[in-house]
Amino acid sequence: MEGEDGGMNRSIDRQAELRRMEEACRQTRHQLDMIEHQIIRRMTALIPSLGRRKYGYRRGRPPEPEAFLTRYRSNLAAITAQRQPEIDALARKLMRQQSAIAALQETIP
């Protein structure tokens, strides 16, 4: 009987640990999502200023459609680069958490 109770307690402990690990993993994913949303918000705020240029029909030339996209991509790359170390660290943490969760799930009957 003692052996069964010990095994059952360990199984319950592992399940509780698994729930804690899954919650930590969800929080890490949430942090990554928050960074993505912050980048999107910054880019959305920049769009009006990216479209405004003194060049265009007023100077006798039509506006270049690719110019806006070039400015947009350049700003997106710069904003993302500022957050890249944090994004990379969270991505590595998420991979470690997912691996640990998978390993623990294999030990739970």
Feature-to-residue mapping (PLM):
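Short, charge/polar-rich alpha-helical segments
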Residues: 7-43, 79-91
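Extended alpha-helical coiled-coil "stalk/arm" regions
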Residues: 32-66
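Amphipathic protein-protein interaction modules
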Residues: 54-86
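Long amphipathic alpha-helical coiled-coil segments
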Residues: 42-47, 73-109
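Short, Lys/Arg-enriched N-terminal segments with co-localized hydrophobic residues
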Residues: 1-7
